[in-house]
């Protein structure tokens, strides 16, 4: 799914009502060209099953193609470190819709919470080796339920003030929607990029469209319109229900549940909305956790090139489980679960930091889409495509470069926290983690081909002897 209610809540928590302007900017100047580039790439490489790494292989070099594939896997490491947190929070609201249990979680010592998170992760790491197919069905149903609940919130949230006569944010004017373009604002851009990314998953469908040169861009523009409506109206609904001038400090952690709790209160339905949403989110988080462990690993290692990935990592047991791949996942994710708890003050700040880290790391994979598009424009005579986003190759290259540069800029700015004093010990600790995490994760990818070369040479020598 390209969109979720959490995107509205998290960005409202970052920017308040000024996020309305940001959404308009992002969708018009980033999401729409991004989606249409994906359409052209999907059309140009319609026979390719390898996704972004195949696009990169066709337009650049095999090594860069490997790094693209590695990036698509490794960005899931912070995601997997954060998912058990989200699962525990969703479960706490499902069990205690008053928020009492969620309050207990929020006050826990970060080391205690992260120990629980580590146990949950390791349990589901084991579960994912069993290939629980029913979870995918449950996850799809839960995801659809959450989407419907999100639309319901927008409609009922906008209507609530007409019933109660009360708007939480006082004196809303045009100025309420215009951000202050300072350093703090620039650090929030990565969360917006994180929210609208991922539409490259739609690329295979461009060739299933009748008259793709006309109908696919129309479909993408409809998708962009739907995202825009959800983002804009959802943000305004949040401003109706929450005071944008006094945003709760734990809105990222608990905001989705506060929103449905308030909605139930406004309509006299008690905890009904929050229970339904929490149950759906629990199932969705559980399913996402299991499948985000297994599926990306199979994509990376299932058809691995021995030039770039050591054969040992592709080793499977009798049940077809990528044993060493799972061990690598366990080590990387467990490290990212435990280490931050040693230097971040409280659980709410830890949750917010990990979510923001995802907004820095996850968009790194979008860079490869834009690089592939620039490569396609450089080699346009080599590839035939039924659909072209921009017919002028030089202009198309510049648009790809704009999206690439903006994504990189947003990721870099997202590394700097604004909720702690600059250059304080905790600020330095967080910035260090934000910088080192992507560097280490990408660095491992650069080291693997070297290890592969050495191990392959050793294998050949042992065979000769």
Label each residue range with its predicted role.
Residues 10, 43, 67, 119-142, ...:
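Membrane-water interface regions at transmembrane-helix termini and the short interhelical loops
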Residues 20-21, 104-112, 140-275, 422-424:
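Helix-loop-helix junctions that connect adjacent transmembrane segments
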Residues 33-40, 44, 48-117, 126, ...:
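Hydrophobic transmembrane alpha-helices that form the core helical bundles
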Residues 71-87, 201-205, 268-311, 366, ...:
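Membrane-helix boundary/coupling elements in multi-pass transport proteins
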Residues 95-131, 147-155, 192, 196, ...:
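Transmembrane alpha-helical segments of multi-pass small-molecule transport proteins
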Residues 114-163, 197, 220-225, 355, ...:
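Membrane-interface loop-to-helix entry segments
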């Amino acid at each position: 799914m390209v969109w979720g209610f959490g995107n509205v809540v998290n960005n409202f928590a970052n920017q308040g009502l000024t996020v309305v302007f940001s959404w308009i900017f992002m969708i018009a100047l980033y999401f729409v060209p991004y989606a249409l580039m994906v359409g052209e790439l999907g059309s140009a490489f319609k026979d390719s099953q390898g996704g972004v790494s195949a696009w990169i292989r066709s337009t650049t070099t095999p090594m860069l193609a490997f790094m693209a594939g590695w990036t698509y896997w490794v960005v899931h490491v912070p995601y997997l470190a954060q998912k058990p947190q989200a699962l525990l929070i969703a479960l706490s609201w499902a069990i205690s819709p008053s928020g009492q249990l969620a309050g207990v979680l929020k006050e826990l010592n970060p080391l205690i919470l992260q120990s629980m998170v580590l146990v949950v992760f390791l349990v589901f790491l084991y579960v994912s080796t069993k290939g629980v197919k029913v979870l995918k069905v449950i996850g799809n149903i839960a995801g659809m339920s959450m989407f419907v609940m999100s639309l319901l919130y927008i409609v009922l949230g906008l209507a609530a003030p007409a019933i109660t006569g009360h708007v939480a944010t006082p004196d809303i004017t045009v100025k309420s929607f215009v951000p202050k373009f300072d350093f703090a604002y620039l650090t929030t851009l990565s969360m917006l990029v994180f929210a609208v990314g991922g539409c490259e998953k739609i690329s295979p469908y461009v060739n299933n469209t009748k008259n793709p040169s006309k109908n696919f861009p129309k479909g993408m523009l409809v998708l962009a319109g739907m995202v825009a409506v959800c983002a804009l109206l959802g943000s305004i609904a949040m401003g109706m229900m929450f005071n944008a001038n006094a945003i709760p400090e734990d809105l990222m952690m608990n905001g989705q549940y506060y929103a449905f709790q308030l909605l139930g209160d406004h309509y006299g339905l008690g905890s009904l909305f929050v229970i339904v949403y929490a149950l759906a989110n629990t199932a969705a988080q559980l399913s996402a956790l299991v499948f985000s462990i297994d599926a990306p690993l199979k994509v990376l290692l299932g058809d691995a090139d021995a030039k770039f990935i050591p054969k040992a990592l592709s080793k499977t047991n009798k049940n077809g489980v990528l044993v060493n791949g799972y061990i690598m996942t366990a080590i990387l994710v467990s490290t990212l679960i435990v280490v931050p708890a040693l230097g971040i003050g409280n659980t709410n700040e830890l949750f917010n930091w990990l979510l923001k880290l995802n907004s820095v790391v996850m968009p790194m994979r979008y860079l490869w889409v834009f690089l592939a598009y620039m490569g396609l424009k450089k080699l346009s005579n080599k590839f035939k495509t039924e659909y072209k986003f921009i017919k002028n190759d030089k202009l198309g290259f510049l648009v790809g470069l704009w999206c690439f540069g903006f994504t990189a800029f947003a990721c870099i700015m997202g590394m700097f926290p604004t909720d702690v004093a600059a250059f304080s010990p905790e600020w330095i600790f967080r910035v260090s983690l934000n910088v080192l995490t992507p560097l280490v994760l990408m660095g491992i990818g650069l080291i693997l081909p070297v290890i592969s070369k050495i191990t392959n040479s050793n294998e050949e020598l042992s065979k000769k002897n």
